[in-house]
């Protein structure tokens, strides 16, 4: 089991999702998530954490995303400490994801 998470680019995150079925956890606030988020992202909050644990296997890769790639590091480390084996944080966060032209779902 890893003792820490790995920082990856938005494109590396997309490759993990496409090739290995990684779960992308968006930790931004509910309003921002509702407005736009990465395609098929799980909205991870304190309230949804139990459902997250029910739906995600500890052996599967988990990618954490925030606004700019800063606060996702703390959540990624928390998930490592909870026993998740492969945890990643997206450098640049949702801003980087969007700038990279990767798929998003929007309310507009």
Curated annotation (Swiss-Prot):
The superkingdom of the source organism is: Bacteria
GO MF, one annotated term: thiosulfate-cyanide sulfurtransferase activity
* Reactions listed under catalytic activity: thiosulfate + hydrogen cyanide = thiocyanate + sulfite + 2 H(+); thiosulfate + [thioredoxin]-dithiol = [thioredoxin]-disulfide + hydrogen sulfide + sulfite + 2 H(+)
Protein EC: 2.8.1.1
- Please provide one cellular component term from the Gene Ontology annotations of this protein: cytoplasm
Whether Transferase counts among this entry's keywords is yes
Q: Name one Pfam family in it.
A: Rhodanese
**InterPro entries per the UniProt record, alphabetical:** GlpE_sulfurtransferase, Rhodanese-like_dom, Rhodanese-like_dom_sf, Thiosulf_sulfurTrfase
Where is the catalytic site?
66
Q: Which residues cross the membrane?
A: none
- Please indicate if the UniProt record lists Phosphoprotein as a keyword: no
Alphabetical list of Gene3D superfamilies matching this protein: Rhodanese-like domain
Q: Which residues form the Rhodanese domain?
A: 18-106
Q: What class of enzyme is it?
A: transferase
The compartments listed are:
Cytoplasm
Q: Which family does it belong to?
A: Belongs to the GlpE family.
- Function of the molecule: Transferase that catalyzes the transfer of sulfur from thiosulfate to thiophilic acceptors such as cyanide or dithiols. May function in a CysM-independent thiosulfate assimilation pathway by catalyzing the conversion of thiosulfate to sulfite, which can then be used for L-cysteine biosynthesis.
Name this polypeptide is given: Thiosulfate sulfurtransferase GlpE
What's the source species' lineage? Bacteria, Pseudomonadati, Pseudomonadota, Gammaproteobacteria, Pasteurellales
